[in-house]
């Protein structure tokens, strides 16, 4: 009799678990991201983090699961809009991804018209949060990057800087902010704007070498721009103390792909590479990354992970309240107050994260070593 009762109890437990699994809510989330074109490298890095977020969320939530539907926007604004519209037709409840403010802006407008939340870490142009989009959220911004780059240059005691920047919206805004801040600190600044289509940077570097004679070069652009500038600098050898860039530069991928160009180059980095995670949340991220990709994560993956996990948690809360189709995801995003791998994240009424700050890393061998600010540095 006891054996029969135990068997029945076990069967009930299994059946109950199966019923819960059968009734678990699965939500489709759209990923609009560049997987081809000029921004493919950064897009793929961000997407890796997004997929790790799904792995961790589905493993730990217990009640809801997320399914991704991904569309390559081919690094094109028009294709980004088309991607959002296609994903909306496939009944996604929200969107994560995007890279490049000029791509994200039109895509976010499309999402806003469709009533879909759009979260990103790929666009820092302040126009993204100053244009009345009620469903747009981002975890990083220009102010955090500007503070880090200017902080490094100031602490290095640099007296003169040449700022080389792309004429795209986000890069122009950041470059102008950097210029104004450094001039206010008494640093001599010369700026050189370039068209995004340019590939030969030797004329610009020649001006830096012969006319500016600056001690330092600050690059504000994207991966392909950095590679072109660094190649030109390697050929012409201007007498500079250092060269730094912002996003998409201080990554192990760049070190692996361009080992001749990266030594001693500075770039923004949330964490050093490799990194030892000590918190449960950090370990869950690292373990998920190792499982899916069998490699160490970089900051692009960290950003993609953080933005997406916050979104998935907001979706889950809205689902619990039955408000998914009533604007609940946006409402829950606005209530976000979470300690994450990039620090505390909250969203102000415009969808911006006022707590965001960056750090500066330097390529040293196969490592990315944090060198600014001093309290976060793990090397010199």
PLM regions: where:
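Periplasmic-binding protein-like
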Residues: 87-99, 119-121, 162-165, 212-223, ...
């Amino acid at each position: 009799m006891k054996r029969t009762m135990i068997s029945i109890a076990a069967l009930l437990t299994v059946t109950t678990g199966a019923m819960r699994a059968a009734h678990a809510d699965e939500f489709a989330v759209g990923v609009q991201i560049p997987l081809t074109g000029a921004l493919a490298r950064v897009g793929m890095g961000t997407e890796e983090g997004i997929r790790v977020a799904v792995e961790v969320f589905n493993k730990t939530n217990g009640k809801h699961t997320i399914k991704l539907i991904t569309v390559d926007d081919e690094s094109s604004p028009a294709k980004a809009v088309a991607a959002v519209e296609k994903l909306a037709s496939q009944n996604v409840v929200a969107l994560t991804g995007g890279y490049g403010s000029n791509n994200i802006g039109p895509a976010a407008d499309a999402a806003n018209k469709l009533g879909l939340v759009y979260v990103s870490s790929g666009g820092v142009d302040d126009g993204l949060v100053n244009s009345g989009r009620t469903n747009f959220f981002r975890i990083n911004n220009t102010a955090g990057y500007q503070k880090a780059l200017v902080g490094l240059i100031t602490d290095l005691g640099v007296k003169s800087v040449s700022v080389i920047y792309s004429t795209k919206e986000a890069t122009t805004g950041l470059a102008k902010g950097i210029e104004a801040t450094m001039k206010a600190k008494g640093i001599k600044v010369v700026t050189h704007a370039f068209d995004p289509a340019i590939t030969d940077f030797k004329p610009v570097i020649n001006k830096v070498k012969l006319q500016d004679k600056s001690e330092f070069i600050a690059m504000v652009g994207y991966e392909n721009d950095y590679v072109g500038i660094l190649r030109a600098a390697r050929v012409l050898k201007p007498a500079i103390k250092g060269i730094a860039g912002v996003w998409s530069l201080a990554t192990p991928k760049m070190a692996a792909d361009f080992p001749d160009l990266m030594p001693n180059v500075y770039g923004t980095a949330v964490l050093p590479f490799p990194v030892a995670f000590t918190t449960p949340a950090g370990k869950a991220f690292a373990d998920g990354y190792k499982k899916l990709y069998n490699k160490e994560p970089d900051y692009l993956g960290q950003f993609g992970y953080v933005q997406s996990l916050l979104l998935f948690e907001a979706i889950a809360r809205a689902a619990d309240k039955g408000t998914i189709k009533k604007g609940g995801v946006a409402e829950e995003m606005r209530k976000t107050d979470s300690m994450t791998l990039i620090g505390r994240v909250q969203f102000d009424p415009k969808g911006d994260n006022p707590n965001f700050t960056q750090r500066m890393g330097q390529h040293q061998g196969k490592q990315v070593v944090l060198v600014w600010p001093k309290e976060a540095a793990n090397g010199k």
